[in-house]
Design a protein with these regions (language model features):
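Aromatic/acidic polysaccharide-binding cleft in carbohydrate-active enzymes
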Residues: 118-159
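Active-site neighborhood of glycoside hydrolase catalytic domains
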Residues: 1-128, 134-135
Length: 159
């Protein structure tokens, strides 16, 4: 699977789109009724430390590895992952979204040397009304106020 990451990096580069950072999975902690790929702490550590990080280091040393996206507020789960010092030595940052925003401040205190991003805005049902705008403003304020250097939007289209 880690080779697939590198193939995507290569394919994007061929199209003139440089990739400078990857995360192993979007919403890796969603336990959904539809097919998904939820991760355990042990699986997260093993895949990133033993497979993805070494492969990126060898094939794309210019690409940073971030943990995430953390869409969970289970601090105990994230602490288990961060307790692996060998893994932490491979990481340059973390991505948070949804409930993950609740643990961002405490994680950032533990690892002030890393970069942090909001990997996906909460677009909800795509109402784009004033209430949704206020909610998004509060999210942007929270993420940037807690040290995130990037805020990414998710947009719902009607077609």
């Amino acid at each position: 699977m880690q080779i697939i990451f590198c193939r995507f990096i290569d394919a994007y580069k061929e199209q003139g789109i440089p990739i400078d950072m990857v995360m192993y999975q979007n919403e890796a902690y969603s336990y959904t009724p539809y097919p998904g790929c939820a991760w355990t702490a042990t699986g997260t550590i093993r895949f990133n430390k033993e497979y993805l990080a070494p492969t990126l280091r060898q094939m794309h040393p210019e690409v940073k590895l971030y943990l995430g996206t953390f869409n969970t507020n289970r601090q105990d789960h994230v602490e288990t992952i961060l307790a692996d010092t060998a893994l932490c030595n491979c990481i340059r940052g973390m991505g948070f979204q949804w409930e993950g925003r609740e643990i961002l401040p405490s994680i950032r205190k533990q690892h002030p040397e890393w970069e942090y991003i909001c990997s996906e805005s909460e677009c909800g049902w795509g109402s784009f009304d004033w209430k949704a705008a206020e909610h998004t403003f509060e999210l942007i304020n929270h993420y940037l106020g807690n040290g995130c250097c990037e805020y990414n939007f998710g947009i719902v289209f009607d077609r």
